[in-house]
């Protein structure tokens, strides 16, 4: 076994590649001196042998063997021939995984403009050439000629566009016997673009732009600054403008655009293979037409088709008709693979599935405390499995990991007791996408619950921007003691009451909570069932309400010896009754107090409703805990 290679990356940078660099990516020299890497045939695999065709899109000589330690012709098999290059087929005997990173290239018979830099917003080619995008497109797609050098012609200017008729007229003048015209050069297509870009002296251009900017104003100044910024970036990165026109295009490794055989013997293939095949076919046809000196109009048409094929490969649908495959589905180009939510960056590089994490729908947990969340049992046993196994072995209930896993899979009752011990004091982190601010991920103490949904305290919903209409949340388990301590001290929901953006409380009662509190404490003169009854304690009132002896809003007297506050002053007696033993009963608006002869309070009954009793008791219990 070879040690695993670990490549450390600081960052990934996207830039322009020179034709030489693209060749370096794909070119390799075999021990016999043969240089391989250029893909020249559109074939993929042989339909009889099911082996890759040589010099095709899946060529084993270019990309490496299709089977581990086996060459194309079968002369060398087994790992003992490692590193040998077969004399017959030229395939290096190595692992097949090299087909995931070895690249090839296609040498184009005519230059082709890169569609990103031509049709992107902004169009860097048109900015650099200081020409309207419409004019640049006319040149690239063979609709107009462009003057590359006006020579001594007074009627022509550099970068002037000419129609077919205008060019024929000038051509007649050039080739007439008494012609005075000299040094007139006109081009069309990406070749003309390549020449125009190569003629730009970036340093000189930047210098003259800086001088112009000093005196320019308004729209013109903004345009000059935009152009200068692009030129400065080219100078800073060491890229050349002519690299925006490609003479060589890379062929990505075959295992990244696979071709697999289905059950019925048919093949399913990546769209990229179809797009590459179109490019190779048109490129080969163009090379053949140039060889046989075909008429200019035919060659030009083929060049335009090659440009369109490369456009479709890089960014299908950016310009012109979208290339479609079977059942009129647009083919996925290189741009489609890397951009968007399902693209390589967001799907595979930035967002990865991690261990010790789960995901489920959230439901409201009204009985939870603010720092708690309800974690489904089957999710908790999976997330905390290593901790549970460790605890089972340490307690002597099982001897090894295999036995512990068997015990867990049988849902043994003892496992749940161990799980309860493990999760006690072990916070978990809940995250709801999109995490737009730091309160989008918070820590909670898990409480085991039945069912498959995560229970969430309603007060923390505004921080997560969560509601219970089908939202999902991810659970992450902090493993190390440091991360657990950090989660508990910094991320616990009860420590995140204020919004980091505004400094105002983000945990505020709303909706059901406000409505419920209002309904419990509201007055309803129509509620008369059980009104005026006396009760010895708060619990008796709640019990009577639960047994439907009294209405929620009926006013009753309940014994309560603590302090009483009301929204209106309640110090003036309404009625005072003196008893035979000298004690007296004082009736206030909201309470009834019995005092002895010395004025000491014997008992106090408050005039309230069962709803207010329930509300008051809930707050008292919350404060006491």
Swiss-Prot record:
Binds 1 Mg(2+) ion per subunit. InterPro entries: DNA-dir_RpoC1_gamma, DNA-dir_RpoC_beta_prime, RNA_pol_asu, RNA_pol_N, RNA_pol_Rpb1_1, RNA_pol_Rpb1_3, RNA_pol_Rpb1_3_sf, RNA_pol_Rpb1_clamp_domain. It catalyses: RNA(n) + a ribonucleoside 5'-triphosphate = RNA(n+1) + diphosphate. One of its GO terms (cellular component) is DNA-directed RNA polymerase complex. GO terms for molecular function: DNA binding; DNA-directed RNA polymerase activity; magnesium ion binding; zinc ion binding. GO terms for biological process: DNA-templated transcription. Its cofactor is Mg(2+); Zn(2+). Keywords: DNA-directed RNA polymerase, Magnesium, Metal-binding, Nucleotidyltransferase, Transcription, Transferase, Zinc. Mg(2+) binds at residues 467, 469, 471. It is an enzyme of class 2 (transferase). Zn(2+) binds at residues 71, 73, 86, 89. Its EC number is 2.7.7.6. Belongs to the RNA polymerase beta' chain family. RpoC1 subfamily. NCBIfam families: PRK02625.1, rpoC1_cyan. DNA-dependent RNA polymerase catalyzes the transcription of DNA into RNA using the four ribonucleoside triphosphates as substrates. PANTHER family: DNA-DIRECTED RNA POLYMERASE, DNA-DIRECTED RNA POLYMERASE SUBUNIT BETA. In cyanobacteria the RNAP catalytic core is composed of 2 alpha, 1 beta, 1 beta', 1 gamma and 1 omega subunit. When a sigma factor is associated with the core the holoenzyme is formed, which can initiate transcription. This is DNA-directed RNA polymerase subunit gamma. It comes from Nostoc sp. (strain PCC 7120 / SAG 25.82 / UTEX 2576).
């Amino acid at each position: 076994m070879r040690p695993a290679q670990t490549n450390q990356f600081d960052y990934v940078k996207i830039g322009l590649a020179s034709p030489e660099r693209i060749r370096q990516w794909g070119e390799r020299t075999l021990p016999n001196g043969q240089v391989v890497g250029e893909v020249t045939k559109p074939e993929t695999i042989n339909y009889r042998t099911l082996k890759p065709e040589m010099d095709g899109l899946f060529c084993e000589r270019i990309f490496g063997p299709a089977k581990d330690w086996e060459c194309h012709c079968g002369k060398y098999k087994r790992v003992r021939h490692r590193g040998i290059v077969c004399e017959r087929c030229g395939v290096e005997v190595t692992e097949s995984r090299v087909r995931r990173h070895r690249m090839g290239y296609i040498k184009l018979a005519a230059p082709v403009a890169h569609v990103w830099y031509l049709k992107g917003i902004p169009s860097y080619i048109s900015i650099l050439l200081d020409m309207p995008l419409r004019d640049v497109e006319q040149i690239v797609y063979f609709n107009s000629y462009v003057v590359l050098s006006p020579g001594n012609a007074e009627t022509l200017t550099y970068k002037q566009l000419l129609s077919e008729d205008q060019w024929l007229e000038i051509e007649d003048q050039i080739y007439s016997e008494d012609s005075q015209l000299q040094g007139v050069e006109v081009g069309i297509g990406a070749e003309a673009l390549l020449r125009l870009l190569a003629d730009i002296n970036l340093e000189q251009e930047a210098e003259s732009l800086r001088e112009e900017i000093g005196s320019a104003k308004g729209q013109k100044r903004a345009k000059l600054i935009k152009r200068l910024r692009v030129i400065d970036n080219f100078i800073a990165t060491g890229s050349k403008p002519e690299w925006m026109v490609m003479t060589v295009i890379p062929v990505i490794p075959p295992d990244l655009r696979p071709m697999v055989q289905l059950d019925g013997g048919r093949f399913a293939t990546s769209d990229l293979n179809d797009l590459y095949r179109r490019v190779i076919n048109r490129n080969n046809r163009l090379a053949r037409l140039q060889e046989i000196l075909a008429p200019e109009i035919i060659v030009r048409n083929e060049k335009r088709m090659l440009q369109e094929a490369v456009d479709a490969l890089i960014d299908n649908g950016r310009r012109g008709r979208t290339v479609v495959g079977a059942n009129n589905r647009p083919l996925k180009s290189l741009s489609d693979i890397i951009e968007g939510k399902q693209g390589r960056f967001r799907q595979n590089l930035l967002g990865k599935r991690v261990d010790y994490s789960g995901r489920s729908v959230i439901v409201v947990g009204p009985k939870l405390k603010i720092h708690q969340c309800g974690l489904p049992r089957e999710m908790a046993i999976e997330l905390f499995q290593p901790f549970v196994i460790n605890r089972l072995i340490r307690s002597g209930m099982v001897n090894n990991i295999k036995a512990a896993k068997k015990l867990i899979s049988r849902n043994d009752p003892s496992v749940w007791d161990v799980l309860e011990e493990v999760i006690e004091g072990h916070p978990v982190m809940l995250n709801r996408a999109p995490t737009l601010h730091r309160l989008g991920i918070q820590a909670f103490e898990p409480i085991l619950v039945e069912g498959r949904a995560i229970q969430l305290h309603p007060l923390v919903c505004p921080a997560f921007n969560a509601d219970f209409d089908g939202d999902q949340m991810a659970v992450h388990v902090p493993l190390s003691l440091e991360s657990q301590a950090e989660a508990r001290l910094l991320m616990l929901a009860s420590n995140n009451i204020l919004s980091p953006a505004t400094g105002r409380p983000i945990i505020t009662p709303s909706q059901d909570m406000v409505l419920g509190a209002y309904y419990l404490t509201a007055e309803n003169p129509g509620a008369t069932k059980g009104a005026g009854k006396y009760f010895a304690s708060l619990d008796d009132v709640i019990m009577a309400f639960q047994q439907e002896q009294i209405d929620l809003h009926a006013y009753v007297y309940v014994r309560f010896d603590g302090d009483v506050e009301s929204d209106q002053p309640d110090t003036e007696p309404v009625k005072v009754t003196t008893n035979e033993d000298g004690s007296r009963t004082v009736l206030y608006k909201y309470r009834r107090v019995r005092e002895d002869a010395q004025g000491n309070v014997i008992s106090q009954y408050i005039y309230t409703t069962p709803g207010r009793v329930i509300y008051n008791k809930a707050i008292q219990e919350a404060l006491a805990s």
